[in-house]
Amino acid sequence: MNKEKNSYRDAIKDVELTMMAIDSHFRTHKGFTDSYLLVMILENEVGETRLEVSEGLTFDEVGYIVGSVSDNILHMHTYNYCEKNREDIYKWLKASRIEKFKSDYAKMLMNMHFGKENNVGSNINLKEEF
């Protein structure tokens, strides 16, 4: 249990460091930039779901990744690196880092926030779990 908590804390520290770099990017580029965060919730042929978050992509790279995915895309969103998207970027980075240590995290996210009763793209409120 302690090992899992330490891994979780390390993941959060990694996100905080990444967000510091992104904040610097926001200060330099006040408006929209040519850099994107790609969020996908994927389902393989046996029904297992996973969350994939790719950082710092150009628009062409986003198109290439989406076009080369062989799994079923249950949810996909692209966030431009700009100040107004800061909170969404932070939440998805956090979710992607935590998912490495919690194997059912993508499925839980999908069920809670992207189910039939909810609108796709609703805001996600990730909370500390320890």
From Swiss-Prot:
UniProt xrefs under InterPro entries: P56
Purpose: Inhibits the host uracil-DNA glycosylase (UDG), an enzyme which removes uracil residues from DNA by the base excision repair. Interacts with host uracil-DNA glycosylase and prevents the latter from binding to DNA. Since the viral DNA polymerase efficiently incorporates dUMP into DNA, the virus needs to prevent the deleterious effect caused by host UDG when it eliminates uracil residues present in the viral genome.
Keyword rRNA processing: no
Assembly description: Homodimer. Interacts with host UDG; this interaction inhibits the uracil-DNA glycosylase.
Protein's name according to its UniProt entry: Protein p56
Keyword Lipoprotein: no
Family: Belongs to the phi29likevirus protein p56 family.
Keywords: Early protein, Host-virus interaction
